[in-house]
Amino acid sequence: MALKEIVEQTVAGLGYDLVEIERSAGGLLRITIDLPWVPGTAGSEAEQFVTVEDCEKVTRQLLFALEVDGVDYKRLEVSSPGIDRPLRHGQDFERFVGREIDVTLKAPIGAAAGALVNATRKKFRGTLERTQSSNGESGVVPGWQIVWSDAPEVKPGQRVSKKRLPAPLQALGFTLDELKEARLAPIVSFKGRGAKAGTEPNLD
């Protein structure tokens, strides 16, 4: 049985979601897990996080499963996603609609950039939104975009004129196939990992 299949079955069997599998130098096998998400429950209750006990439970079961299948590794590490959780699947994007995320495109934005964005740019930060697009015979299919504003950061003690116009909102639509990487923006908040996005500056 392939490594990914072993890990997915073990993690799911214990009631968790598999986020990431990484093999590092020195034989380290790193597994990242998260608590499962039920569609339609976002914001209905306080967000819960993976605990040390959760990681220990998954570690014990994985040690047994990997030994049975003869997987070659030196050390196993099971951890929670952290504040910069990777987004890899459609369900991940559904889960974090309304959150601030960082995306890296496989190719520069090019002609779609318009006048306000550098055409060679590939990295963006903005609030994740769900859109819909037409796909021929398939009809309407889910799509995604991030929205941001390039408003200058207000320094402590700085007065902002009431006459200053707000910076225009910008949007970037994308499909998952166009992404090289996507992660939750690592913004520390006392409201938890899923705190609603603000107007943080986007990445160059």
From Swiss-Prot:
A GO cellular-component term linked to this record: cytosol
GO annotation, biological process: ribosomal small subunit assembly; translation
Keywords: Cytoplasm, Ribosome biogenesis
Top-rank taxon, per record: Bacteria
InterPro entries for this protein: Ribosome_maturation_RimP, RimP_C, RimP_C_sf, RimP_N, RimP_N_sf
Compartment list: Cytoplasm
Recorded family membership: Belongs to the RimP family.
Protein name as annotated: Ribosome maturation factor RimP
UniProt source species: Albidiferax ferrireducens (strain ATCC BAA-621 / DSM 15236 / T118) (Rhodoferax ferrireducens)
Taxonomic lineage from the root: Bacteria, Pseudomonadati, Pseudomonadota, Betaproteobacteria, Burkholderiales
